Amino acid sequence: MSRIGKKTIVIPAGVTVTLNGSTATVKGPKGELVKEFNPEITINIEGNEINVSRPTDNKNHRALHGTTRAILNNMVVGVSEGYEKKLELIGVGYRAQKQGDKLVLNVGYSHPVEFVAPKGVEIEVPANTQVIVKGYNKEHVGELAANIRAVRPPEPYKGKGIRYEGEHVRRKEGKTGK
């Protein structure tokens, strides 16, 4: 049995989960998420708990079992609490600012880099070297944060670049002169 798949998901107050065939709809105070799952995996809602089960123990069903449960749990947590990723800009002259609904990054290129947040994701800039990506869909929040980080990933010699808050960047020695 999958260690993740066999855990039940507790539905918090204010969140409703409905099943229509293999499509799950999760509604909560932060928003609504709809996802279609593999029809071979069985999802049962009993009271305020969700159980996920698989038909056989073959490799494909074992993999889908844990994945289905994890995605459902992320949907429930997302619409009730939401997700956020914090990014830091480290480097001389590196700064971020919000212009309307766009995030504008000045990170050492000849031009500013602009990002527009997708529906359900919002970007905050509390300081000019800090960016917070918030939303109820974990996948969209993580993808936008990764795309922002990919503009200027941290380099190992000086540590300059965009990194996640608390991310450890492994540093390297520079070349030594003769």
UniProtKB/Swiss-Prot annotation:
Matching InterPro entries: Ribosomal_uL6-like (IPR000702), Ribosomal_uL6-like_a/b-dom_sf (IPR036789), Ribosomal_uL6_a/b-dom (IPR020040), Ribosomal_uL6_bac-type (IPR019906), Ribosomal_uL6_CS (IPR002358)
Keyword terms of this UniProt record: Ribonucleoprotein, Ribosomal protein, RNA-binding, rRNA-binding
SUPFAM superfamilies: Ribosomal protein L6
Pfam family of the protein (one): Ribosomal_L6
Any single GO BP term: cytoplasmic translation
GO cellular component: cytosolic large ribosomal subunit
Matching PROSITE patterns: RIBOSOMAL_L6_1 (PS00525)
Single GO MF annotation: rRNA binding
Known partners and oligomeric status: Part of the 50S ribosomal subunit.
Function recorded in the entry: This protein binds to the 23S rRNA, and is important in its secondary structure. It is located near the subunit interface in the base of the L7/L12 stalk, and near the tRNA binding site of the peptidyltransferase center.
Protein family membership: Belongs to the universal ribosomal protein uL6 family.
Protein name in UniProt: Large ribosomal subunit protein uL6
Species name: Listeria welshimeri serovar 6b (strain ATCC 35897 / DSM 20650 / CCUG 15529 / CIP 8149 / NCTC 11857 / SLCC 5334 / V8)
Designated gene of the protein: rplF
